[in-house]
Amino acid sequence: MSDIFRFDTEEQTLTKEKIKLKKPSKYRVIILNDDFTPMEFVVWILQMVFHRSRAESQQIMLKAHITGKALCGVYSHDVARTKVAQVQQLAEQHGYPLHCTMEVEEGEEES
């Protein structure tokens, strides 16, 4: 909480108000499966963009392959948006249709 002090010059009183700060929302970055992007490329993306170990990357890739999507990580809005853009850019550069999305973490409200 932050304190704000106001001074009213007409009445010459000092008032202290409490302001409750809201935590910023967190966003889930989800990788989506497709039938064209090689599994090794997905593993490489997870290592490069999301800084996952090879074993973690393989687990995430397999989950996306089996269920159609998988969680890459939970980040602030700007970081999540940047990671989605990085995946898009790398996939396009290599000629693959790989996609990522971002969604607000459950229990969080978008501001």
Curated annotation (Swiss-Prot):
A single GO BP: protein catabolic process
Alphabetized Gene3D superfamilies for the sequence: 3.30.1390.10
Pfam families referenced in this protein's UniProt entry, alphabetically: ClpS
Residue stretches in coiled coil: none
Matches recorded under NCBIfam families: PRK00033.1-5
Functional note: Involved in the modulation of the specificity of the ClpAP-mediated ATP-dependent protein degradation.
Subunit structure: Binds to the N-terminal domain of the chaperone ClpA.
Family: Belongs to the ClpS family.
Protein name as annotated: ATP-dependent Clp protease adapter protein ClpS
Organism: Leptospira interrogans serogroup Icterohaemorrhagiae serovar Lai (strain 56601)
Organism taxonomic ancestry: Bacteria, Pseudomonadati, Spirochaetota, Spirochaetia, Leptospirales
Gene: clpS
